[in-house]
Amino acid sequence: MKINIILLFVGLILAFAVLSNAISIKNDGGVNPFDNNNSGSGSGSGSGGGSSSSGSGTGQSSGTVSSSGSASNNTSSGSQSGNASSGSSSGSSSGSSSGSSSGSSSGSQSGNASSGSSSSGSSGSQSGNASSGTSSGSSSSSGSSQSGNASSGPSSGTTSSSGSSQSESSQSGNASSGPSSGTTSSSGSSQSESSQSESSQSGSASSGPSSGTTSSSGSSQSDSSSFTTTGSQGSSGSSGSSQSDSSSFTTTGSGSGSSQDSMSGSDSMSGSDSMSGSDSMSGSSFTGGNSGGSTSTGSGSYSGNPSLTGSSEYSSSSSGGGSGSHGGSSSHPNGWTDVGQFLLGLAEGLVSTVASNTKLCFQSVGSSITDFENAFQLIDSGFSRLSKPLIEQGLMDLGSGLLEVAIAFETCNVQNLASEIKALATNIESGELGILEVIVKETINIFHNGNQLTTEFKLTISDYKSQNYLGMGYNIGGIVGILLKD
């Protein structure tokens, strides 16, 4: 019973002390902590610990200030809040900061509380007791960001904060400005350098003592071309064209009859000319027997690298003694022309063996490989520049070149391959889709029905650059063989 009386007495004393303190504060112009009708505004900010926080409050408020976290008068970890006689600021603030706040204030200090330590050296409270928004004391905060709103009322004292706030904004988007350097590939364009072949057209015809006429007509694409007839009776005519470095035809002796020498289209020599013996050509040879009713003594020789358009047939009926030979020399192995080597290589790339008479015809057929040279110059540039249009233009030139090959094969009686190559060449030249497909990714590849032909094309380019016409033709023959299979 005595204990209860003592406790009641102590409680009355404490209540009286609190009431006296409140009255004293009111008389001093302060704020009654139990008066909820006071109005005021307050705002504050705090930062630190590498994170940013912001908060603001204005206007009238009543009640208590609340925020995320709690704080006592001395030390808080979270946001500082407390009892407000003037009310709580409308708004909210949250966040955390590392640092310290020290000093004494009877004003409002609402905002973000530090997660460090807070010390107070006054008997007042540091938790937002403000009527007019006045604040005295000092508050310091350190951290890595500064944010918040200042108080709406005057403040006596200092508030300092140290820290830094950094924000990095990334700009995303597409920027295209200024010139760009590098490789620019053109689409829809083609570049080609065409090689022009130089040829001289010259020809001469001379006749020695002869009771007859000798005529020579046609064109000769060569350095020199001469036809000489001596000591013969009758008439001889020569028409056609020859592509060679040098050629000469000589007949000596006596004979009678007539001969027609046609070297354009289908080449035939028929008549009763006195030539008996064997005719041979370097690389391949052919022989013919001569019999007839005329006699001739002497020798006939033919030297050089002729290039004839057509097949050659030699028929004669004469009697007598003599010999004729085909031979000569040039800058190519075995006396072969560029075209002859190319056609031979292409045929060997398609079939296992080539007949000797076909080889002879290839050696003398008049054709051109200019389209092939243009084609692989463009294809080479397309590989280097990753340009699909250049390669496609080169493939069209390849088709044009194959049309020339088909004509040469027809001339040399390779009819079965000639018709197939002609049909294929027409499709390639027209750019028909599906024959050859050009795919551009990191590199360029050429396909036909799933079969990659890139390696074959690059080997052909290498042979073209080194002027290996036999190898160039062989690789093209391999490509054509694959295309003809399907």
From Swiss-Prot:
Signal peptide residues on this chain, from the entry's feature table: 1-22
Sugar attachment sites: 37, 73-74, 83, 112, 129, 149, 174
Stretches for region Disordered: 30-332
GO cellular component: extracellular region
Keyword Protein biosynthesis appears in the UniProt entry: no
Main location: secreted
Lineage: superkingdom: Eukaryota
Bias (Gly residues) ranges: 41-60
Protein name in UniProt: Secreted protein C
Organism from which the protein derives: Dictyostelium discoideum (Social amoeba)
Gene: sctC
